[in-house]
C-alpha cells in the first residue's frame, strides 16, 4: 500500500472521529462533576449519570441525583442544572430544577416537595406539589400551593391553606410569611409570622380568627385585623382589631371605623352554672 493511500485513510479516520465527537457533544454522560456558579462551586452526582445538552445549556443528572453547595443540598430523581456564559467566556450554573421526590437539606432545615427550583443568584428555593412541608428544630410549615425559602432573608413563604405549627400553637391562613433567626448553635427559630387571608390562630385555650395577623412568637403577642373573633371556652369577643397575649390569656379588642363597616365591639360571656343538688 502506497504512502498516499495510507495518508488518505488516516485523514478519513480523523474526519470520521471528528464527526462522531460533534454528533455526541450534545449527549455526553458522566457520573459526577464540579460546576462553577456565581458564588461557590456546586457538586452534582447521580447514579445513572449526567447528560450534557450544550445546545440547551443544561446538564441533566438522573437517578438519585444530588447537588451540593456548602451546607446546602438538593436531592431528587432528576436534577437539571441550567448554565450561562459569563463575560470571560466561562460558564456558570445559575438555576437548579428538581423533578420528583424533592428534598432540600441544610444544617438547620429540611423541606419536601414534588418539584423544586433553586435560584442560585438569590439563594431562593421554591417547591410545589403535594404534601409540601418545611421543618426546623421547633417549627413545621405546610402548604398546598407553594412553599418558598429565601436563605439570605431567612424567610419562608407558604401559600394555599398554609399552616405553621410550634408545639400546641398553630397559625393557619391563605398565605404565611415566617421570619426566622439563628440561634447560638446555628439552628433556626421562627420569631415572627405574618398571616393574610382566613387567618386562624389556635392554642389549647383559645381560637382567634381574622383577615390578617402578625404573631410575635417570642413575646407570644398577636395583632389581628379585620372581622376579628376570639373564642375562649364558651365566651366570644368580636371586633375590628385585637391584641392578644397568648402567654397571659389577656385580649384587647378595638373598633376601627371604615375597616369593615363595624364600629362596635361585641362580646358574649358565659359561665358554668352549678345545678342544685337533689335532696
Regions found by a protein language model. Give the residues of each.
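Mature-chain termini and adjacent capping regions
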Residues: 2-279
Amino acid at each position: 500500500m502506497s504512502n498516499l493511500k495510507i495518508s488518505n485513510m488516516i485523514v478519513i479516520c480523523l474526519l470520521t472521529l471528528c464527526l462522531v465527537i460533534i454528533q455526541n457533544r450534545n449527549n455526553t454522560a458522566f457520573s459526577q462533576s464540579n460546576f462553577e456558579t456565581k458564588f461557590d462551586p456546586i457538586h452534582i452526582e447521580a447514579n445513572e449519570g449526567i447528560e450534557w445538552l450544550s445546545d440547551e445549556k443544561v446538564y441533566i443528572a438522573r437517578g438519585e441525583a444530588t447537588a451540593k453547595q456548602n451546607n446546602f443540598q438538593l436531592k431528587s430523581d432528576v436534577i437539571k442544572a441550567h448554565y450561562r456564559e459569563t463575560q470571560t467566556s466561562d460558564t456558570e450554573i445559575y438555576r437548579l430544577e428538581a423533578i420528583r421526590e424533592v428534598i432540600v437539606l441544610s444544617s438547620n432545615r429540611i423541606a419536601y416537595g414534588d418539584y423544586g427550583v433553586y435560584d442560585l443568584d438569590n439563594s431562593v428555593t421554591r417547591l410545589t406539589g403535594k404534601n409540601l412541608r418545611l421543618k426546623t428544630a421547633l417549627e413545621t410549615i405546610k402548604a398546598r400551593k407553594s412553599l418558598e425559602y429565601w436563605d439570605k432573608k431567612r424567610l419562608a413563604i407558604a401559600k394555599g391553606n398554609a399552616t405553621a405549627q410550634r408545639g400546641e400553637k398553630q397559625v393557619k391562613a391563605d398565605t404565611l410569611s415566617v421570619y426566622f433567626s439563628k440561634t447560638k448553635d446555628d439552628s433556626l427559630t421562627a420569631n415572627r409570622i405574618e398571616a393574610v387571608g382566613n387567618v386562624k390562630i389556635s392554642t389549647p385555650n383559645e381560637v382567634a380568627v381574622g383577615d390578617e395577623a402578625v404573631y410575635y412568637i417570642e413575646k407570644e403577642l398577636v395583632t389581628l385585623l379585620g372581622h376579628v373573633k376570639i373564642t375562649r371556652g364558651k365566651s366570644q369577643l368580636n371586633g375590628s382589631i385585637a391584641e392578644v397575649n397568648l402567654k397571659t390569656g389577656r385580649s384587647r379588642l378595638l373598633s376601627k371605623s371604615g375597616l369593615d363597616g363595624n364600629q362596635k365591639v361585641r362580646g358574649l360571656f358565659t359561665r358554668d352554672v352549678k345545678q342544685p343538688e337533689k335532696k
